[in-house]
A protein has these predicted regions:
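Helical mechanochemical/support elements of P-loop NTPase systems and associated helical scaffolds
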Residues: 45, 53-56, 60, 83, ...
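Residue-identity detector for glycine
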Residues: 4-7
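N-terminal regulatory modules in eukaryotic regulatory proteins
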Residues: 189-293
Length: 293
């Protein structure tokens, strides 16, 4: 141990009346804690009950957990209406706070207004790093843009019918059809599936929707890769993935049948050269890629 470090520990022991061993033990624990724990993003999850499906809530919250901690979970809608009955069954289980909003005027969406007002109130608390907006409604485009202007990260979740304006206003947009396919797969493995034919029909429909994969945007992906490479002509997978999302927030490898971006890259051998490189001072390997000549 260096003399400078030794002097620091001796001073701590004198100041706090601790033994030298106790100071070393506490300091080592703090060092391990600081190195192993990365701060998680504090996220506000706001759900538009009129434009979201309760059937995907478990998969939705699991997806959100990939981005950070759902510190606030609220859902907005008229829960006296029959259309919201499916949501009422899951609110308590997933600790989601319902915000009742009656339709005061025909033709006006009071739910949208309530959600936007709450979002702005939460924004000005300065307690959050980002927002998760669960809706397929383009009326929230302005809200997403406002949150971004304040420096917060915006994650959007909605169906494929969601207008481009809202999807592109988010930093990242996830299609709920992808999450629905996860629910369908689990349900098919469950022995309770045979109890209701209606459930089986819904499952098959959900799977069919996802199996109809869109055409792979080869030109867009290669163009993004060209902008991601360094001076050597290679790009790390992380840099490439980040650039893809910036250009097209709803880009998701799962839409094309691959669980992760790395799986997609490895499968497209006709498009990419790939290398796994050891990072200095670590056993971890990083995937690098470039376009094939």
């Amino acid at each position: 141990m260096r003399s400078g470090s030794l002097g620091k520990y001796v001073k701590l022991a004198d100041d706090y009346k601790l033994s030298y061993f106790e100071v070393i033990l506490v300091s080592s624990r703090q060092m391990v804690k600081s190195e192993s724990e990365e701060p998680s993003l504090r996220l506000a999850v706001l759900i538009d009950a009129d434009n979201a499906q309760a059937t995907v809530i478990e998969a939705l919250l699991a997806e959100i957990a990939r981005f950070g901690e759902a510190t606030v979970k609220r859902i907005y809608g008229d829960f006296t209406a029959n259309a919201s009955s499916s949501w009422k069954k899951v609110l308590q289980k997933y600790a989601i706070k319902p915000v009742q909003q009656f339709a005061y005027t025909t033709g006006k969406n009071a739910t949208d207004s309530a959600l936007i007002i709450d979002a702005m109130d939460l924004l000005y608390t300065r307690k959050f790093d980002g927002f998760c907006l669960i809706t397929s409604d383009s009326d929230f485009t302005g809200l997403a843009m406002r949150l971004r202007e304040e420096g917060l990260t915006v994650y959007g979740f909605g169906e494929k019918k969601t207008p481009d304006a809202f999807r592109n206003a988010c930093h990242k947009f996830v299609f709920t059809e992808i999450l629905r396919s996860n629910v369908a797969s689990k349900s098919r493995e469950s022995p309770t599936e045979t109890k209701a034919k209606k459930k089986t029909t819904k499952i098959k429909t959900a799977v069919k929707e996802v199996e109809q994969k869109p055409e792979f945007p080869e030109e867009f992906v290669l163009s993004a890769l060209e902008q991601s490479v360094d001076d050597t002509g290679w790009a790390s997978l992380g840099v490439f993935g980040s650039y893809l999302t910036k250009l097209q927030p709803d880009f998701d490898s799962r839409l094309y049948g691959y669980k992760k971006l790395s799986d997609l890259v490895k499968a497209k051998k006709n498009l990419f050269d790939i290398e796994e490189r050891q990072t200095s001072g670590s056993s971890r390997k990083v995937l690098y890629l470039r376009a094939k000549n």
